[in-house]
Amino acid sequence: MTIPTYHITIADKIKAYRNENNLSLKEFGKLIGVSAQAVCKWEQNICYPDIIFLPHLARILECRVDDFFEEL
């Protein structure tokens, strides 16, 4: 199974933001309203954020929702 490029883009943005801001998985999850386990799965491309989280993720990551899909 091939993971679509946009999943990788979202994962990379989340991981970079967490690293730049020294946030743990748990701390970032609290910002979004999800568990640390969910964030970990997003970063590892095991699964991806539900569409309802994308606007909130975009605000936190200071990007637009369509930036998550820029490589499609």
Predicted regions and their residues:
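A secondary-structure capping/hinge motif
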Residues: 32, 47-48
